[in-house]
From Swiss-Prot:
Entry keywords, A to Z: ATP-binding, Kinase, Magnesium, Metal-binding, Nucleotide metabolism, Nucleotide-binding, Phosphoprotein, Transferase
InterPro entries named in the record: NDK-like_dom, NDK-like_dom_sf, Nucleoside_diP_kinase, Nucleoside_diP_kinase_AS
Job description of the protein: Major role in the synthesis of nucleoside triphosphates other than ATP. The ATP gamma phosphate is transferred to the NDP beta phosphate via a ping-pong mechanism, using a phosphorylated active-site intermediate.
Gene3D superfamilies: Nucleoside diphosphate kinase-like domain (3.30.70.141)
Annotated CDD domains: NDPk_I (cd04413)
Leading EC class: transferase
Protein name: Nucleoside diphosphate kinase 1
Catalytic activities: a 2'-deoxyribonucleoside 5'-diphosphate + ATP = a 2'-deoxyribonucleoside 5'-triphosphate + ADP; a ribonucleoside 5'-diphosphate + ATP = a ribonucleoside 5'-triphosphate + ADP
Length: 148
């Protein structure tokens, strides 16, 4: 089954959106496989966002991620990467549809509440970076009510 990496950024944590965000993924039928509440240091943030290191906003992004605790999670389910991106909404909150996390809770692109893997390959890489110890192998008793 497919897995994705989701991170609630410092603004989402500070604004008390952790429960709401987890609830949206659970209500869709996805399974939480790993969760950490963590303060990220600069080298780790730089490693996570290494693919953006040449962008002009890179330093500001890293400063933002290390400014407070984040919630790092692994979610599992059929099509979870693509569907997770739809639940999250567009990177720019002003382009996000109402009903998405960013459409409902974010205004500025630099404070957009949440990160989600953009492809299965990046999810695999991000999960390995954030959860080198692995994830919890379990299945919800609701699994047969969600999947054919």
């Amino acid at each position: 089954m497919e897995q994705t990496f989701i991170m609630i950024k410092p603004d989402g944590v500070q604004r008390g959106l952790v429960g709401e965000i987890i609830s949206r993924f659970e209500k869709k039928g996805f399974s939480l496989k790993a969760l950490k509440f963590i303060n990220v240091d600069r080298p780790f943030a730089e490693k996570h966002y290494a693919d953006l290191s040449a962008k002009p906003f890179f330093n500001g992004l890293v400063e933002y991620i290390v400014s407070g605790p984040v919630v790092a999670m692994v979610w599992e389910g059929k099509g979870v990467v693509l569907t997770g991106r739809k639940i999250i909404g567009a990177t720019n909150p002003l382009a996000s549809e109402p009903g998405t996390i960013r459409g409902d809770f974010a205004i500025d692109i630099g404070r957009n509440v949440i990160h989600g893997s953009d492809a299965v390959e990046s999810a695999t890489k991000e999960i390995a970076l954030w959860f080198p110890e692995g994830v919890v192998n379990w299945q919800s008793s609701l699994h047969s009510w969600i999947y054919e």
